[in-house]
């Protein structure tokens, strides 16, 4: 019975996180229509995503510690209520400024999903079961980035861009009702109440947590760099149509799905899987960088390294998240907040940096992805050395 309850909670958690992920990308096929309806240039509409990502990352730093003090349920319900209110504003506005503000408010609400994606599995599982649960969760979460642009394009074609936000409103209302009706409180009953600064000091004082955190930031930042650069490289440099770019853009995502599945196999050692993950990320960065040394760039030199990096990152996310969260059962909310918040902030910084670098070839992208691969490897080496002396921690 408990096992079935935990599975149901994971399914609800996948839907909770999907709301936030779909809000980020569902309107992308409708950007041209949004710009025309709001009487602004298309580039200005991109500010909607920037505002969303900023508050999505920052809000997680607050949701986690609060959930450690008052529980998971009330924090989830408050966050989703904020999202629904913001989405209602987005549906009815005719001003880009108001839409940007509403998007920032949406991110402020769905940040709770990013925290709970890392916190609830730690409440429910330990060790190998935690790794397996995180792998299943990541596999489920990876479906929404594939579906969101397709759903958004269909809704925009059949109605208009506002239908995308109406869809998000209905989806969020259904998820919120389900969690209010069936989700139990998962915060450990004997969890001590600690001050926020004390919690952060405990986490940042743990070298293992810091290493796993930097690895997770590097993994997501490498993906963000590809997402930020690939549209320009394939569209402006290679001259591909927008529809072709949209299709090619999502092709590496199944590799991340497969990586998450690969990491969740219970018969493999944690350290072995980690080595495979970090090597894939570093090798992918080099494969993305090397073609530029010879002045070569085509669809294959972009997508093959990207798919390899997505595969490595797909393995890394559940593995490193489990490694970071395992030692802190009573600080799961705060730990999840730091992991989720700093991951998104770090990826946003790297995406902004990539926009400042030359985009005439894949050299800048390859350099950034290689640096992220090096960061991941350098953070893993001390952990691997420690494991060889102490045994498997997860």
Swiss-Prot record:
Q: Could you tell me which Gene3D superfamilies the record lists for this protein?
A: Multidrug resistance protein D
Topological domains (Cytoplasmic): residue ranges? 1-8, 68-73, 117-134, 184-212, 264-276, 320-329, 386-394
Instruction: Please give the start and end residues of each transmembrane region.
Output: 9-29, 47-67, 74-94, 96-116, 135-155, 163-183, 213-233, 243-263, 277-297, 299-319, 330-350, 365-385
Lineage at the top is: Bacteria, Pseudomonadati, Pseudomonadota, Gammaproteobacteria, Enterobacterales
Checking NCBIfam families in the record gives: 2_A_01_02 (TIGR00880), PRK11652.1 (NF008654)
GO annotation, cellular component aspect = plasma membrane
Location within or outside the cell? Cell inner membrane
What domain of life? Bacteria
Please name the GO terms of the biological process aspect recorded for this protein, alphabetically: xenobiotic detoxification by transmembrane export across the plasma membrane
The protein in question is named Multidrug resistance protein D
Q: Which organism is it from?
A: Escherichia coli (strain K12)
As for what it does, the entry says:
Multidrug resistance pump that participates in a low energy shock adaptive response.
């Amino acid at each position: 019975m408990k096992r079935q309850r935990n599975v149901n909670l994971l399914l609800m958690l996948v839907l909770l996180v999907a709301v936030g992920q779909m809000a980020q990308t569902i309107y992308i096929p409708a950007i041209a229509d949004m710009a025309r309806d709001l009487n602004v240039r298309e580039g200005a509409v991109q500010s909607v995503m920037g505002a969303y990502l900023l508050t999505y990352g920052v809000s997680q730093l607050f949701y986690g510690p609060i959930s450690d003090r008052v529980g998971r349920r009330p924090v989830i319900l408050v966050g989703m209520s904020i999202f629904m209110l913001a989405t209602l504003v987005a549906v009815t506005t005719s001003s880009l400024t108001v839409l940007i503000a509403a998007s920032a408010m949406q991110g402020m609400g769905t940040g709770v999903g990013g925290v709970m994606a890392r916190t609830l599995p730690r409440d429910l599982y330990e060790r190998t079961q935690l790794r397996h649960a995180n792998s299943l969760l990541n596999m489920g979460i990876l479906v929404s980035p594939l579906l969101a642009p397709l759903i958004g394009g269909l809704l925009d074609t059949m109605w208009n861009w506002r239908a995308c936000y109406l869809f998000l409103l209905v989806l969020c209302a259904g998820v919120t009702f389900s969690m209010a009706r069936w989700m139990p409180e998962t915060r450990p009953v004997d969890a001590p109440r600690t001050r926020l600064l004390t919690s952060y000091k405990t986490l940042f004082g743990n070298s293992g947590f810091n290493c796993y955190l930097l690895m997770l930031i590097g993994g997501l930042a490498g993906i963000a760099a590809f997402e930020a650069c690939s549209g320009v490289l394939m569209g402006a440099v290679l001259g591909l149509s927008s529809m072709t770019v949209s299709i090619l853009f999502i092709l590496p995502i199944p590799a991340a799905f497969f990586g998450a599945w690969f990491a969740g196999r219970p018969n493999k050692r944690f350290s072995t899987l980690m080595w495979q993950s970090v090597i894939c990320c570093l090798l992918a960065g080099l494969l993305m960088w090397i073609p530029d040394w010879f002045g070569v760039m085509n669809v294959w030199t972009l997508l093959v390294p990207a798919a390899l990096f997505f595969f490595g990152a797909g393995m890394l996310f559940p593995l490193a998240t489990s490694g970071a969260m395992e030692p802190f059962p009573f600080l799961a909310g705060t730990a999840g907040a730091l992991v989720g918040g700093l991951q998104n902030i770090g990826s946003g910084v790297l995406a902004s940096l990539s926009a400042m670098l030359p985009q005439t070839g894949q050299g800048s992208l390859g350099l950034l992805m290689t640096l992220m691969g090096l960061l991941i490897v350098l953070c893993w080496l001390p952990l691997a050395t420690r494991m060889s002396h102490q045994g498997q921690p997860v």
